[in-house]
């Protein structure tokens, strides 16, 4: 440890002090100093300065009432002024007293680092502009009305990442909500109406959604937009899950473009109430066709099948076809079109 150290006290040489008390009362100030060697840029040991040195320092200071100042400092020695290691710290203890009765003695304990100011209570880094020289926690715990210690705006990294993730998802969620509340209502109503029309509003086991045959996708699958081909319809008895009443329907299967299409046709009521519309290839004209199930040949009853033709000879009772099961159904229809019988029948 190197620096300047001067030791003096009120009780030093009590006899001389009592003799000169009345004559030199203003010179009774005594000091205890420890100076860091980096201030003077030397590596000298302890040096004892005469009292005249401190008298000169006192004359240079601002004129004030007689005070007693005790200052004590501890610093580690170091010969290099550019040494900025973390161990280069200072420890001070200051006690300032005044002879005036109005001003009371004050004391403080401060641990400082180079360029920083530490809290006088806990030793943590204090706020730069805090007049009480304390950190936010200690300043609030003591109840100081400090305007420097406002609410902290610092957010941890985990909270920032969580908030950024929420903000990234929020725009997409708003778009979905806007679509569901906005134009999605009319589209849903149209889909429901189309579904009800295709199902006929009755107790059906399956519903078929009809789309425009001229839409895109037919070119890639090489399927014709419209075809006219004979088909064999097999009468069958069906019942709904919700409704115990049974009804009759017709099942068929055709081969178009190397693909097998099969389905069930349900009873939609009298032919005068339901019409089937079809459009031509160019979309300029539309024709209305009535689908009537005819008994064209006597063999239709024995094979339990009906051929659909565009004639108006009359309808056949489906129940008679269902009860007249004599021979197994032919696996192939006319024209070489294969038929795959359902396992339900």
Curated annotation (Swiss-Prot):
InterPro entries: SHI (IPR007818), SHI_C (IPR006511), Znf_LRP1 (IPR006510)
DNA-binding segment(s): 119-146
Pfam families: DUF702
GO molecular function: DNA binding; DNA-binding transcription factor activity; metal ion binding
Function: Transcription activator that binds DNA on 5'-ACTCTAC-3' and promotes auxin homeostasis-regulating gene expression (e.g. YUC genes), as well as genes affecting stamen development, cell expansion and timing of flowering. Synergistically with other SHI-related proteins, regulates gynoecium, stamen and leaf development in a dose-dependent manner, controlling apical-basal patterning. Promotes style and stigma formation, and influences vascular development during gynoecium development. May also have a role in the formation and/or maintenance of the shoot apical meristem (SAM).
Protein name in UniProt: Protein SHI RELATED SEQUENCE 7
Binding positions (Zn(2+) 1): 119, 122, 130, 135
Gene name, Swiss-Prot/TrEMBL: SRS7
Positions of short motif Required for homo- and heterodimerization: 256-259
GO biological process: auxin biosynthetic process; auxin-activated signaling pathway; mRNA transcription
Positions contributing to Zn(2+) 2 binding: 119, 135, 139, 146
